Amino acid sequence: MTTGQQGLTYNAVYGVNLASAMSEYGYTSTVIPSKGSLDNLDKVASGAAQIGFTQADAFQYWRGRHVNEAQKVDIIGELADECVFVAVKKGGKVSDEGDLKAGVKIAVGEPTSGSYASWQYLQGLEKDYAKVETYAKGGVRSLAKVTTGEYDAFLWVSAPDRSNKFLEAVNQEGSGLAMIDMNGWHVDDKLPNGKPVYELKKAVTESGWLSDSKVKVPCTKTLVVANTDAGDDMLETASTVLLKNLSRVLGTNGK
């Protein structure tokens, strides 16, 4: 079972919980860390792993580039929402998503990450995004470079209902950073199962005494995918667990 970076949600929550639930049906699963959604899809398609996790938009991006390999990958379940967030420098070159065009520099995460795939996929849908200078750099260090002006924006993908290291950094007093809406376009692309790749949602970026700060952002689902040759019994069991025991796989504070 190919998951995600050590200690992050795909690895430490979804992978561990799905493996535990499947063990009750007699299946022993090894939960292996990975570099993210695209890495997982490569491993599932090649048979190096039987089950993996991926963002829905990363799956669409990958399918478009691996038409033959995609025949070996089946969606067997879906988990929670993940949303595309963009942080910018207050008073900088980018004040809203309409400023994401030629002459702007954005850091979007490592080349095997879901956030990188999200941006590549969005660039194919929105022509102005395709003109933005893109850097395959992630981590808080890259976010910090937005404050110095080395980058104009930083993109990441995370659950809309829980804090993470990037949001915490943006919300830090005196960070000089701000979040922007990403809702200036309409996307109606569909997954192979007929469901939309993105839905626009309001996500809380900071909780306040009187009101919460929110941004409108495109959200995609976490999909569970499997190799089509993994065996009918095993795939049936995994699908059953995902249907009947979803809250257990998500974990008590599931994303």
List PLM regions with ranges:
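Structural recognition of the beta-strand scaffold that forms the well-ordered cores
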Residues: 31, 50-54, 85, 107-108, ...
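Pocket-flanking alpha-helical
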Residues: 15-16, 32-70, 141-146, 161-170
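Short Pro/Gly-enriched coil loops immediately N-terminal to beta-strands
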Residues: 75-84, 171-174, 183-184, 215-221
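A structural signal for short loop-to-beta-strand junctions that line the ligand-binding cleft
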Residues: 69-79, 204-216
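Bilobed "Venus flytrap"/periplasmic-binding protein-like clamshell domains
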Residues: 1-28, 82-148
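Pocket-lining segment of extracytoplasmic ligand-binding domains
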Residues: 56-58, 92, 115-213
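Extracellular/periplasmic juxtamembrane helices and adjacent flexible linkers that interface
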Residues: 221-255
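Signal peptide-directed extracytoplasmic domains
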Residues: 57-93
